Amino acid sequence: MAAPRAHPAPRPLALVTGASSGIGEALTHCFARAGHDLVLVARSVDKLQALAAKLKAQYQVAALVMPADLASLEAAQRLARSLKRRKKIPDVLVNCAGVLEQRPFVHMRAADHQAMIDLNISALTAMLSHFLPMMLARGSGRVLNVASIAAFQPVPSLATYAASKAYVLSLTESLSEELKDSGVSITALCPGITATQMLSHATQANQQLGKLPHFLIGDVHEVARQGFEACMAGDVICVPGVINRAAMLASRSTPKWLLRRVGGLLARATS
């Protein structure tokens, strides 16, 4: 009598927000290449469907498209409920959805500031609130929060954005201790200026950004690769690029008043 055929082990599942472009899209390739099935979350259905088809064809993985506007307070809860009903609890949660506005604070509308807070802070917090308990109940999981090099110092003309990313970094560091010995790790990816659609939009608003030397602009695929590797290794903080790491270390040892002064000079020089 033939032995019963063993069922192949299910592939790990990675949920990526902000998956339709930039670092988020690049990260979907990293996880798919490593054999993860994907849940793709962003607002654009067309972009997500095109990405899902590409991932399936290139890596032979499953890719579930779940369009959502995470700026809506209920969106994270709806995602969690839907995946729970499907018995699809992510092994990896990647919080990459975000928005950037580069202008002096008073030149922006209150709605612009609120949009950054809603997506960069509130949506990320809601995703963690709904998905971390599932991972803890299972006893395993990984989280990758996309912050920014701007999280380490004040950045005039990026005041709200930098503050929102400082929140992400601080929250990640705090949770890394709360989650110790739980089987769940959490990582903050803190990229510098990266060649993405977000940078293109910022450059349209401020043409001086387009004059930055190429060596200061990170490659999106390399940033994603380093973030992926840090997440899988359980590192708490990942700062891609030698220059960015040097800037991060300098910011942690430089007096706050001097950081503010230098930031102000740079903001005026690029305004």
Descriptions of predicted regions:
Residues 36-51:
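Conserved glycine-rich Rossmann-like NAD(P)H-binding loop of the short-chain dehydrogenase/reductase
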Residues 178-246, 260:
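SDR active-site lid
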Residues 128, 164:
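Active-site helix of classical SDR
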Residues 104-106, 112-117:
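Substrate-binding pocket helix/loop in short-chain dehydrogenase/reductase
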Residues 20-22:
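Conserved glycine-rich cofactor-binding loop
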Residues 96-101:
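Conserved NAD(P)H cofactor-binding loop of Rossmann-fold oxidoreductase domains
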